[in-house]
Amino acid sequence: MITDPGPAPPAAAGDPAAAAAAVHVSGLRKHYGDVVALAGVDLAIGAGEFFTLLGPSGSGKTTLLRLIAGFERPDAGRIELGGGDVTRTPPYARNVNTVFQDYALFPHMTVGQNIEYGLRVRRVPKAERREKVDRALEMVRLPGLGNRKPAQLSGGQRQRVALARAIVNEPQVLLLDEPLGALDLKLRQEMQLELLRVQREVGITFIYVTHDQEEALTMSDRIAVLNHGSIEQIGGPVEVYEWPRTPFVAGFIGVSNLIERDGHTITVRPEKLALIKDGEPEPPDAHVEPGQVRDVIYAGVLTRYVVDLDAGGELVVSRQNAEPASVATGSRVRVSWRPGQAFTIPQGPDQGSRAGEGKQ
């Protein structure tokens, strides 16, 4: 039976039911003319949680972040920070800070002056400011660079300064709007680990906006997957990847195979599949789909095989390149998976048509 759902998904990490909620939004709606940016969002984020808003362009993730920051007002709904209603509170009166993709550093100021700017506005004594700035520079691993100008730093260093400027104010919540988007791949991967380390050290609630699934899976305690102004699923990285609740989530998070069988939508990840050549034995208790290899795609550490199935549909199979590929285009093969590796996805009124959106 190919619809075996396997084991139940684990409980989401950082569930605010087990911790005080730092941020709570209910019934949040926002329109721009005829465009519905948010369609009644309900969300609770635990104190000290690294929470990611993940979705494609136009999904509403940045709008939600801007509403929490106070840069815009909702058309309906309520926003609470630490249990207090801040729905109509201006940005400067909210205990939050925001880190943007473009850093937003003052070019005429030194690194140290940029970091201490918020402290000066709050009239923190000079000696305390210096101590906090030095501590923040140590935290982001830029000790001794306080006298440099932003133009003398690399992109990664400037992003660290922007982070230090935000955390030095000790906000209740730190909002990060795709802060790594302007960095190259290697530096972006390094900064993912740095952000996670800093968040764990300071214990501040991070709300992180991105369209990058790898970033979300790498750093987050929990992830909210947004689409067309609504939340499709909230859960830990393992849960949203291994147990997607909608076709959209299955298609947007990584690569997922979706096939129709017996009136059900079946999903199975490419890395869960085995490719069996003619003459090779089939694994016991496995479900098997015969077909023909249409494409063989070399991708460095792995090779992807696109198989047209005799029963209809296609499956993408990923195999690690531990040894040379031995299956060629046009080969007859059987694709197999074990019970629990494939499961059905409930169909909503408009989900089926979106099953393939966002594949990467």
Functional labels for PLM-detected ranges:
Residues 77-85:
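Conserved ABC transporter NBD signature motif
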Residues 62-65, 161:
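ABC ATPase nucleotide-binding domain helices that frame the ATP-binding cleft
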Residues 54-56:
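The feature captures the beta-strand-to-loop junction immediately N-terminal to the Walker
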Residues 2-6, 256, 265-360:
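Non-catalytic connector elements of ABC transporters
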